[in-house]
Amino acid sequence: MDLQITCTEIIKPSSPTPQHQSTYKLSIIDQLTPNVYFSIILLYSNAGESTAKTSDHLKKSLSNTLTHYYPLAGQLKYDQLIVDCNDQGVPFIEAHVANDMRQLLKIPNIDVLEQLLPFKPHEGFDSDRSNLTLQVNYFGCGGMAIGLCFRHKVIDATTAAFFVKNWGVIARGAGEIKDLIIDHASLFPARDLSCLAKSVDEEFLKPESETKRFVFDGPTIASFQETFTSFERRPTRFEVVSAVILGALITATRESDDESNVPERLDTIISVNLRQRMNPPFPEHCMGNIISGGLVYWPLEKKVDYGCLAKEIHESIKKVDDQFARKFYGDAEFLNLPRLAGAEDVKKREFWVTSWCKTPLYEADFGWGNPKWAGNSMRLNQITVFFDSSDGEGVEAWVGLPRKDMARFEKDSGILAYTSPNPSIF
């Protein structure tokens, strides 16, 4: 890629953060969230006006948006479990790309996509780094890519998706933004976690992994859903896609080259958005890590059955409600989890499933229309992240596994039958 950085500027909130809002407390959920960055990349076929006008438009609207999302413009002080909302601002990087966007990004390549970001997310653990950094890439053909890196300790994917949507709302002058900051740290206060046997960051820092994109199109998902005849209800898009992914992982794990080290069980942690599950519900767009996890245990000796997997996934998510969250986090029941306490007596493999589907990434309209494509370029390990396809019907599954496992995973009969490996986005 022929990319040249042309400008770097610090964008600060348009209005100073009031003194009574100068400290943003982290919650126990923030503490338990891995200290990593995650990325979002938004592609636009045509950014409309001249580069100079577009740049000025984005900077001014970003400054106004940060007034509402002021912790993103602050500094994380993890030893104090706070964000100092000091309005230090966020780096805004501009780059010119000589290549044609459609040709360069026709087939998403993680090495190419990474260059559209301000830094590689898996290398961005420096505590002095900003909570948000972004890079706006202008292509010679008139297209544009906005790459953003968010600190996960401070926000979750739902917050990030609403951030880019609301940035667009402000850029277009299309409405007001309110009720973003809630005091979830009072409900789920931070705690001393020195007793934990396992760092929450460990499993995300292993470099020997490979990330690939598998796309389930809408008609294939709909047809597959109809085969679940034993269900009392139609399984959701998330449930059937997750079942295929986990089924392939179970098979790949069984076929390990090291038979002496094959796990007895696959433990899957499914990320669940708590906002609408609380009583009373939190605003759907409120800021923070307001997530929990459902658990699915699957013995490796058990035959893969998509119907059973989908039911297990459904039941695990159903258990995550207001009462669960208040006990698990508010009463610190998470400390009893064997995986954190170091009391495991079962050889197991852990895998994470998280979905960004139904978040408003495709509503990030800055005045020149919705993005052509919304995705990421994260190098993942033992996790899959789901995104809506651009038509809103399909699912893009980005899967990160150790290389040997990926070679077996992508040859699984379910993956071959129901997905297209990394198809064109144009």
UniProtKB/Swiss-Prot annotation:
Annotated metabolic or biological route of this protein: Secondary metabolite biosynthesis; terpenoid biosynthesis
Protein function: Acetyltransferase involved in the biosynthesis of limonoids triterpene natural products such as limonin, a compound with insecticidal activity responsible for the bitter taste in citrus. Catalyzes the formation of 21-O-acetyl-isomeliandiol from isomeliandiol.
Family in the record: Belongs to the plant acyltransferase family.
Tissue and organ distribution: Expressed in maturing fruits and in juice vesicles.
Positions annotated as active site in the UniProt record: H152, D365
Subunit (UniProt): Monomer.
Reaction equations catalysed: isomeliandiol + acetyl-CoA = 21-O-acetyl-isomeliandiol + CoA
EC number, as in UniProt: 2.1.1.-
Keywords, sorted A to Z: Acyltransferase, Transferase
Name of this protein: Limonoid 21-O-acetyltransferse
Pfam families: Transferase
GO MF annotation: an example: acyltransferase activity
TM segment ranges: none
Record InterPro entries: CAT-like_dom_sf (IPR023213)
Tree of life domain: Eukaryota
Broad class of enzyme this protein falls into: transferase
